[in-house]
């Protein structure tokens, strides 16, 4: 599939993120300062094979969406929060962090350029800023990248669950997903570290994801946060440096509290999780940008399959997902100032 061009007739069954718009936003960091950003045709970049990011992993990224409302207006969801997390990741990796205002300008100018490519609901325009070190030096393992590039890509995406909501099968692994001090950094190395266990679990157990539980404490999956739900109660791990602070997670918990849910954030053990899901009304779910909230039907641990509740996507999971999607699409009031309009 041609991933460098897109039009409104692009196939809706295309894999998530595989179709890109014709334009991208780009800015370079050189001589100690960020240069002016600009819009360019999406395509190859002049990156040296000795670039710092290719050898020493100095790269981080974000992922969020712009939505077309029923009235035709376009809004970016939680732009400020995602830029804040990008800055946090850049600092953790000793990358030169651009001014947040410049990042916002790049995102909004790109969405404005690509207005025609923003699908109507239930689709959206997925936005991917990526920041990486470009200085060509294969001997710079102990040195921060003195040159860098920031690119913002845009990808029209459609309904993640076009075939209907299906419960996930999750394999439990008693190990950490990544180095504890890097868990909250959105960097490619963390996803690569989770890929081997995830592929093995898929091959051996038909699992969709791996839930990492180092020392018997529930952490996260390879690409999503983990929540337990029962009635109007939600239990999830409290934030620390060992796992990614999901913006979708934050949005869901904020909405849930506003709607009267009892939300608890603390250390959650695997034993507690297994007891929770054994209840008839027990639910478990994964939260993330792509799917918003996905129900878990089975946890696989120690050679056993543990059914979550009745094994289907639970009613509270569906209700919370629908509530957040309604806010994202502008169908419900923006109580928390999460929407940034595209002029």
Residue ranges and their predicted role:
Residues 115-123:
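Short secondary-structure junctions
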């Amino acid at each position: 599939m041609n991933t460098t061009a897109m039009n409104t007739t692009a196939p809706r069954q295309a894999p998530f993120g595989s179709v890109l718009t014709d334009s991208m936003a780009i800015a370079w960091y050189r001589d100690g300062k960020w240069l002016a950003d600009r819009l360019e045709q999406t395509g190859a970049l002049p990156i040296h094979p000795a670039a710092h990011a290719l050898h020493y992993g100095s790269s981080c990224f974000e992922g969020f969406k712009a939505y077309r409302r029923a009235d035709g207006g376009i809004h970016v969801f939680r732009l400020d929060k995602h830029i804040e997390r990008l800055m946090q990741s850049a600092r953790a990796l000793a990358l030169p962090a651009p001014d947040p205002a410049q990042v916002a300008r790049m995102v909004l100018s790109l969405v404005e350029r690509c207005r025609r490519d923003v699908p109507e609901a239930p689709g959206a325009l997925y936005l991917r800023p990526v920041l990486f070190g470009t200085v060509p030096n294969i001997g710079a393992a102990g040195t921060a990248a003195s040159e860098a590039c920031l690119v913002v890509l845009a990808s029209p995406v459609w309904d993640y669950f076009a075939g209907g909501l299906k419960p996930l099968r999750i394999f439990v692994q008693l190990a950490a997903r990544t180095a504890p001090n890097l868990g909250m950094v959105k960097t490619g190395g963390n996803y690569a570290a989770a890929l081997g266990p995830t592929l093995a679990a898929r091959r051996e157990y038909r699992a969709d994801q791996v839930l990492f539980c180092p020392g018997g404490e529930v952490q996260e999956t390879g690409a999503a946060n983990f929540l337990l739900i029962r009635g109007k109660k939600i239990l999830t791990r409290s934030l620390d440096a060992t796992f990614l602070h999901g913006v979708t997670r934050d949005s869901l918990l904020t909405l849930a509290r506003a709607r009267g849910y009892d939300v608890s954030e603390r250390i959650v053990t695997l034993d507690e999780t297994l007891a929770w899901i054994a209840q008839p009304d027990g639910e478990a779910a994964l939260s993330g940008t792509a799917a918003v909230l996905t129900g878990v039907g089975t946890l696989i641990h120690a050679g056993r399959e543990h059914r979550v509740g009745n094994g289907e996507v639970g009613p509270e999971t569906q209700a919370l997902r629908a509530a957040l999607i309604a806010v994202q699409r502008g169908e419900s009031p923006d109580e928390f100032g999460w929407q940034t309009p595209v002029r």
